[in-house]
């Protein structure tokens, strides 16, 4: 005849038999592990931001270069911030590379591949 405590082996419940539950020690271990991983994530994010995050945007010389690239106008040319709200049609969007083909050309009918036939 089996004993009453046969579902316990060496003080631990057998897996798959009866009710499985989390002990207080396991719950405390999971909680401590979660807190440690959260703290490590926060420290990692803080360190990454401190090392190189947003530093490039705060640099004045790079900020001016970014503004020139985005608005195609430089502050040295006498334009101020109010001129940056010019519509796209008024901007001169010439290709950067001279004699470059257009970025998009419509394909003619003779250039398309043959139709699929099973």
UniProtKB/Swiss-Prot annotation:
<dbReference type="GO" id="GO:0005802">
    <property type="term" value="C:trans-Golgi network"/>
</dbReference>
<keyword id="KW-0812">Transmembrane</keyword>
<dbReference type="GO" id="GO:0005886">
    <property type="term" value="C:plasma membrane"/>
</dbReference>
<keyword id="KW-0256">Endoplasmic reticulum</keyword>
<comment type="subunit">
    <text>Interacts with PMEL. Interacts with GPR143.</text>
</comment>
<dbReference type="GO" id="GO:0005794">
    <property type="term" value="C:Golgi apparatus"/>
</dbReference>
<comment type="function">
    <text>Involved in melanosome biogenesis by ensuring the stability of GPR143. Plays a vital role in the expression, stability, trafficking, and processing of melanocyte protein PMEL, which is critical to the formation of stage II melanosomes.</text>
</comment>
<keyword id="KW-0597">Phosphoprotein</keyword>
<feature type="modified residue" description="Phosphoserine">
    <location>
        <position position="108"/>
    </location>
</feature>
<protein>
    <recommendedName>
        <fullName>Melanoma antigen recognized by T-cells 1</fullName>
    </recommendedName>
</protein>
<keyword id="KW-1133">Transmembrane helix</keyword>
<dbReference type="GO" id="GO:0042470">
    <property type="term" value="C:melanosome"/>
</dbReference>
<feature type="region of interest" description="Disordered">
    <location>
        <begin position="78"/>
        <end position="118"/>
    </location>
</feature>
<dbReference type="GO" id="GO:0033162">
    <property type="term" value="C:melanosome membrane"/>
</dbReference>
<keyword id="KW-0333">Golgi apparatus</keyword>
<feature type="topological domain" description="Cytoplasmic">
    <location>
        <begin position="48"/>
        <end position="118"/>
    </location>
</feature>
<dbReference type="GO" id="GO:0005789">
    <property type="term" value="C:endoplasmic reticulum membrane"/>
</dbReference>
<feature type="transmembrane region" description="Helical">
    <location>
        <begin position="27"/>
        <end position="47"/>
    </location>
</feature>
<dbReference type="Pfam" id="PF14991">
    <property type="entry name" value="MLANA"/>
</dbReference>
<keyword id="KW-0472">Membrane</keyword>
<dbReference type="InterPro" id="IPR029242">
    <property type="entry name" value="MLANA"/>
</dbReference>
